[in-house]
């Protein structure tokens, strides 16, 4: 590969596993013939950003510019770009490239491509490391750019590029999107609250399952869930046993799967999208005797992500956010670690991060 021309950029980076983010000047490649460049307006803070800045998964490369819930406005397109033009509202989620030829890619599931390149902290083809959306602009292959519906507010749409697709994809893929179905959503956090909104928009009956009675009013009266179960209440769980077609489990803390499997109907599906640090016990007998299934799911493919955001536009689905300035990001990370946010932090990049005068 020949020499790649570069363009100055500015963002916030973690320099070591302390996880503290500070101003960082770097370069991005010039706009290639199939690239879309856009000014970043907003970027959501995902819980995985917190893990990555502290190298808690053992895969971080420093300096690390996080952010994979990125939205903005197109400023330049390459000569062979056909889907986008300057001035349009776009976003980039967790992926910026994949091989394009493996079974996963040909099936539209680039998220499972063994050679997929994540939006930050991964080696790119030009021997650079990808930098994410805590920055003033992005450049990305056209095929990994998502069009944002005009009616959606960009700040509240940003988290959908991770949280939204994480809950939407398994519901669609596993057929848990049929009107009249009964769907359980475990956990009412960044993923769970969006899961409730999509499941309701699909026409399903939704029950929120939580350890805390305190979230009942929020779940039913504000988010529109049909029912609420306290997972620590044996009577509530017993009364609801065998009633659910599927459950989306968004919880990352260690918890028992047995009560959740009990809530499922014959052939019911429990989909894990949270990522507990320690292994969970899997009771096998409910799987054998009632053909219940447990599976996992990770974000979604690009076509599926576009479908998700289009559905969000149709039904006015957005994340519930707390908009913050760039200089508040380290405090936000501390609060996120304590689960002190309802439900997603979003950085006002364009108005609070030092601008790049060359844009």
UniProtKB/Swiss-Prot annotation:
<dbReference type="GO" id="GO:0005886">
    <property type="term" value="C:plasma membrane"/>
</dbReference>
<feature type="binding site">
    <location>
        <begin position="210"/>
        <end position="215"/>
    </location>
    <ligand>
        <name>NADP(+)</name>
    </ligand>
</feature>
<feature type="binding site">
    <location>
        <position position="99"/>
    </location>
    <ligand>
        <name>Zn(2+) 2</name>
    </ligand>
</feature>
<feature type="binding site">
    <location>
        <position position="102"/>
    </location>
    <ligand>
        <name>Zn(2+) 2</name>
    </ligand>
</feature>
<feature type="binding site">
    <location>
        <position position="69"/>
    </location>
    <ligand>
        <name>Zn(2+) 1</name>
    </ligand>
</feature>
<dbReference type="Pfam" id="PF00107">
    <property type="entry name" value="ADH_zinc_N"/>
</dbReference>
<dbReference type="GO" id="GO:0009809">
    <property type="term" value="P:lignin biosynthetic process"/>
</dbReference>
<feature type="binding site">
    <location>
        <begin position="297"/>
        <end position="299"/>
    </location>
    <ligand>
        <name>NADP(+)</name>
    </ligand>
</feature>
<feature type="binding site">
    <location>
        <position position="113"/>
    </location>
    <ligand>
        <name>Zn(2+) 2</name>
    </ligand>
</feature>
<comment type="subunit">
    <text>Homodimer.</text>
</comment>
<keyword id="KW-0479">Metal-binding</keyword>
<feature type="binding site">
    <location>
        <position position="250"/>
    </location>
    <ligand>
        <name>NADP(+)</name>
    </ligand>
</feature>
<dbReference type="InterPro" id="IPR011032">
    <property type="entry name" value="GroES-like_sf"/>
</dbReference>
<dbReference type="GO" id="GO:0047681">
    <property type="term" value="F:aryl-alcohol dehydrogenase (NADP+) activity"/>
</dbReference>
<feature type="binding site">
    <location>
        <position position="274"/>
    </location>
    <ligand>
        <name>NADP(+)</name>
    </ligand>
</feature>
<dbReference type="GO" id="GO:0009617">
    <property type="term" value="P:response to bacterium"/>
</dbReference>
<comment type="function">
    <text>Involved in lignin biosynthesis. Catalyzes the final step specific for the production of lignin monomers. Catalyzes the NADPH-dependent reduction of coniferaldehyde, 5-hydroxyconiferaldehyde, sinapaldehyde, 4-coumaraldehyde and caffeyl aldehyde to their respective alcohols.</text>
</comment>
<keyword id="KW-0560">Oxidoreductase</keyword>
<dbReference type="Pfam" id="PF08240">
    <property type="entry name" value="ADH_N"/>
</dbReference>
<feature type="binding site">
    <location>
        <position position="162"/>
    </location>
    <ligand>
        <name>Zn(2+) 1</name>
    </ligand>
</feature>
<keyword id="KW-0521">NADP</keyword>
<comment type="pathway">
    <text>Aromatic compound metabolism; phenylpropanoid biosynthesis.</text>
</comment>
<feature type="binding site">
    <location>
        <position position="48"/>
    </location>
    <ligand>
        <name>NADP(+)</name>
    </ligand>
</feature>
<protein>
    <recommendedName>
        <fullName>Cinnamyl alcohol dehydrogenase 8</fullName>
        <ecNumber>1.1.1.195</ecNumber>
    </recommendedName>
</protein>
<feature type="binding site">
    <location>
        <begin position="187"/>
        <end position="192"/>
    </location>
    <ligand>
        <name>NADP(+)</name>
    </ligand>
</feature>
<dbReference type="InterPro" id="IPR020843">
    <property type="entry name" value="PKS_ER"/>
</dbReference>
<dbReference type="GO" id="GO:0008270">
    <property type="term" value="F:zinc ion binding"/>
</dbReference>
<comment type="similarity">
    <text>Belongs to the zinc-containing alcohol dehydrogenase family.</text>
</comment>
<keyword id="KW-0862">Zinc</keyword>
<feature type="binding site">
    <location>
        <position position="68"/>
    </location>
    <ligand>
        <name>Zn(2+) 1</name>
    </ligand>
</feature>
<dbReference type="InterPro" id="IPR013149">
    <property type="entry name" value="ADH-like_C"/>
</dbReference>
<dbReference type="InterPro" id="IPR013154">
    <property type="entry name" value="ADH-like_N"/>
</dbReference>
<feature type="binding site">
    <location>
        <position position="166"/>
    </location>
    <ligand>
        <name>NADP(+)</name>
    </ligand>
</feature>
<keyword id="KW-0438">Lignin biosynthesis</keyword>
<dbReference type="GO" id="GO:0045551">
    <property type="term" value="F:cinnamyl-alcohol dehydrogenase activity"/>
</dbReference>
<dbReference type="InterPro" id="IPR047109">
    <property type="entry name" value="CAD-like"/>
</dbReference>
<feature type="binding site">
    <location>
        <position position="105"/>
    </location>
    <ligand>
        <name>Zn(2+) 2</name>
    </ligand>
</feature>
<feature type="binding site">
    <location>
        <position position="46"/>
    </location>
    <ligand>
        <name>Zn(2+) 1</name>
    </ligand>
</feature>
<dbReference type="InterPro" id="IPR002328">
    <property type="entry name" value="ADH_Zn_CS"/>
</dbReference>
<dbReference type="InterPro" id="IPR036291">
    <property type="entry name" value="NAD(P)-bd_dom_sf"/>
</dbReference>
